């Protein structure tokens, strides 16, 4: 939809299995296949920060007429993909020890499994902070913003459950309760008519993935019949310019 609306769209993948059709017909960089030699790639995978490498150059190669409309970059993380949580973090970013260092989780003490998972969460924090720093560095050029939503949670041994994927009706909250993080630069707030006080007041509001599609369309002012303002979490915090 964003591509059809004229935006320059770029999909960056750092997870095996690809985008499963979601990124068809848009420019895509598959870091799993590239595995560019360096400290951010080892053995058969790369750490998520690799998606920030060469990003300016990748964006510059997108069509100029689309870049003039706006740039949207999707980053598909490896994140906390299990069961080998320990592989998701560089050695220097492991604040929780000891951690489970095998994908056979039943061989580890539960706290070791939790530590390995928590290390992956801490590294995602670092990745998001680095992405926001990159965006802040481009505020004179663009009006940047960031939305982060996890696709699922994870069971770490509670009630003998591991990983995720139980039917929604039976899945515990650990598999269903995920974070949604929004960061808007001042230029983006002004351009979009967003009231920061209104947004902060919504911080504790329960959301679902159903809100994501409509919220992105609203933020980017995409006019389409499929847009539902009732599912746009920013709609009542936005004043038309």
Language-model features, listed with the residues they occupy:
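Catalytic domains that recognize anionic headgroups
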Residues: 1-241
């Amino acid at each position: 939809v964003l591509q059809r609306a004229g935006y320059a769209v770029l999909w960056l993948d750092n997870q095996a299995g690809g985008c499963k059709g979601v990124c068809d017909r848009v420019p895509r960089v598959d870091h799993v296949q590239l595995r560019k030699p360096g400290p951010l790639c080892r053995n058969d995978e790369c750490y998520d920060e690799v998606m920030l490498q060469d990003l300016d150059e990748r964006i510059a190669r997108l069509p100029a007429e689309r870049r003039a409309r706006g740039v949207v970059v999707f980053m598909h993380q490896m994140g906390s993909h299990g069961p080998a949580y320990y592989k998701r973090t560089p050695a220097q970013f492991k604040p929780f020890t000891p951690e489970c260092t095998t994908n056979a989780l039943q061989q580890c003490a539960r706290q070791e499994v939790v530590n390995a998972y928590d290390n992956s969460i801490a590294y995602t924090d670092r990745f998001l902070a680095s992405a926001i720093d990159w965006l802040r560095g481009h505020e004179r050029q663009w009006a940047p913003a960031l939305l982060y939503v996890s696709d699922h949670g994870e069971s770490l041994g509670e009630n003998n459950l591991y990983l995720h994927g139980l039917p929604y009706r039976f899945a515990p909250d650990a598999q269903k309760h995920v974070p949604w993080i929004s960061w808007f630069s001042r230029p983006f707030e002004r351009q979009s008519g967003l009231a920061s006080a209104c947004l902060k007041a919504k911080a504790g509001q329960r959301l679902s993935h159903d809100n994501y599609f409509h919220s992105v369309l609203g933020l980017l002012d995409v006019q389409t019949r499929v847009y539902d303002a009732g599912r746009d979490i920013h709609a009542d915090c936005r004043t038309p310019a």
